[in-house]
Design a protein with these regions (language model features):
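C-terminal tail/sorting-segment detector
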Residues: 196-206
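Residue-level detector of functionally pivotal "anchor" positions at catalytic/ligand-binding pockets or at interdomain
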Residues: 161-185
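A recurrent domain-boundary module in secreted/ectodomain proteins
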Residues: 147-165
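Short hydrophobic/aromatic-rich beta-strand motifs
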Residues: 133-136, 181, 197-198
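Generic structural signal for well-ordered beta-strand positions
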Residues: 189-190
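Consensus positions within tandem repeat domains that build extended binding/scaffold surfaces
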Residues: 5-10, 28-33, 51-56, 74-79, ...
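Structural signature of tandem-repeat unit edges
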Residues: 1-3, 13-26, 36-49, 59-72, ...
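A structural signal for leucine-rich repeat
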Residues: 123-128, 152
Length: 206
């Protein structure tokens, strides 16, 4: 499986955890829209694009890490993720769509590793108290972020510290404890089979 399609898991309120493997390159529009019970999302380091409304209304998410492989974040991709307090944006992101993080009113920290300030469409951080949040960016780029909308509106803009060295990549099977996989009907599946599976009570796409 190389992509998660349009509306694939929309409205699955019982979904609590998602791991998107390194084989997936795109997350479609509305893919996880309205998954209100989703508390954990791990995005593999081959994903290049996150579609419009992809994670909208995932109100239980408290943090999200967008890996360095991603170049574009779609419009309203994380709109109304009311529990988000921390967002990490990888170094490869070049564009962020309209109102991508609108109404995420609890955001306190945004860590952006892009040395070139990403292009943003209108209202990326609209309807949240951005003046109370801190933007963490590469030291060499801090002056550019300070003069570019909407980034300049953050209450604090600081350099990433030495401890914030980068984004951990999703490890393959060699870095994981082996566990059994089951399909959505409860049948155990063979190693290497592609699809959407349940592993340790969590949904996994591969």
């Amino acid at each position: 499986m190389t992509s998660i399609g349009w509306d694939a898991f929309a409205g699955c309120s019982g979904l609590t955890s998602v791991t998107i493997p390194n084989s997936v390159t795109s997350i479609g529009d509305y893919a996880f829209d309205g998954c209100s019970g989703l508390t954990s999302v791990t995005i593999g380091n081959s994903v290049k694009s996150i579609g419009d409304y992809a994670f909208r209304r995932c109100s239980a998410l408290t943090s999200v890490t967008i890996p360095n492989s991603v170049t574009s974040i779609g419009g309203r991709a994380f709109e109304l993720c009311s529990g988000l307090t921390s967002v990490t944006i990888g170094s490869g992101v070049t564009s962020i769509g309209t109102e991508a993080f609108s109404d995420c009113r609890k955001i306190l920290d945004v860590y952006c590793y892009a040395e070139k300030v990403p292009y943003t469409e209108s209202g990326v951080f609209i309807c949240l108290p951005i003046e109370n949040a801190t933007l963490h960016v590469p030291d060499a780029s801090i002056d550019r972020y300070k003069v570019t909308a909407p980034w300049r509106s953050f209450g604090k803009i600081v350099a990433l510290t030495e401890d914030e060295t980068g984004i951990d990549e999703l490890k393959g099977e060699n870095g994981k404890v082996k566990t059994a996989l089951y399909d959505l009907s409860g049948r155990r599946v063979q190693k290497g089979q592609k699809g959407v599976f349940i592993q340790n009570g969590k949904v996994m796409v591969r």
